[in-house]
Amino acid sequence: MILTITGYSTALFSTWYFVEELRLLLDAGDGIAPTLLQKSRKIDHIFLSHADRDHVTGLLRLNELNARDGFPAVYYPTDAGSISALETFSKQFDERVKKTVWHPLGDQQQVQLRKDLFVQSARNNHVVKAQLHEVKSLGYQIYQTKNKLKSDFVDLSGEALRQLAETLGRESLTDEVRTNLLAYSGDTPAENFDQWNNTQILIHEATFLTRAELATLETNRNQHSTLEEVLAAVADLNIQTLILGHFSSRYSEEEIDEAIRRFCTAFHVTIPVHRLLPGQTHWDILRSDPIN
């Protein structure tokens, strides 16, 4: 399955990614509804990574456009108090959105989207002031499941399998096989990269370009990743495609692309690498040419 992913991601201003085939939105930054227009009505599930305003301020209009019984479903970190406040305000502000369902999530919780598809949350340390027991920022992994016939039964005839299914139950004949279709880091420091291993598509933030630049910043601000760290880590993982976003607007297109190519060469990254440039909406990202 080649997913149709459209997104906008500029640090400080707005971030969102729409996965069309899954009717799913990752974050809901400003401008999503007027950008997607009627396509925004296809969104059934919204997964918010954290409460920073550049990830949630497009939600009011999007929710009003999509509001119907039980949809859209909005999922968010359980201790992100500003998002809970946004739920309360939106229901007071607009009667039409009262049927929207809001779901707080903890770490490693699963959300079943359909029989063969679920999303799993993963806590990160983006929010500096979060206590160890608090979940204020999440990444997400999207899994597709299929039932595969157990090796003990592969040589049996259809009739024999039917009889066994009646006797033992169909579920006893198969194993569940999970495929990690897509992973989304949200805003996060460069950490716990092993959790993204074996994903087909990783969307990861790269706010700054180099470790040296990150080292000069204040340590009490919310934490982010660098392009250098991400590509160094991805080089050791089994990932099919990398999408980089959340670049700071301080960088030009030329600076970002040159750095991507330089670090891909330095760390021997050979998988396709796509990027979302600051200030630009990128349509159908996976069908565009990779930068490397």
PLM segments and residue spans:
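Active-site-proximal loop/helix segment associated with metal-binding centers of metalloenzymes
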Residues: 117-197, 201-206, 210-211
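Binuclear metal-ion centers of metallo-dependent hydrolases, dominated by the metallo-beta-lactamase
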Residues: 97-114, 191-292
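Acidic/glycine-enriched edge-of-secondary-structure segments
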Residues: 17-25, 39-52, 206-225
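Conserved beta-strand hairpin/beta-sheet module of binuclear metal-dependent hydrolase folds
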Residues: 1-39, 138-142, 148, 175-185, ...
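Active-site neighborhood of divalent metal-dependent phosphoester bond hydrolases
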Residues: 72, 79-106, 250
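Metal-dependent catalytic neighborhoods of phosphoester/phosphodiester hydrolases
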Residues: 58-65, 85-92, 252-261
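Active-site metal-binding motif and surrounding structural segment of the metallo-beta-lactamase
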Residues: 32-77
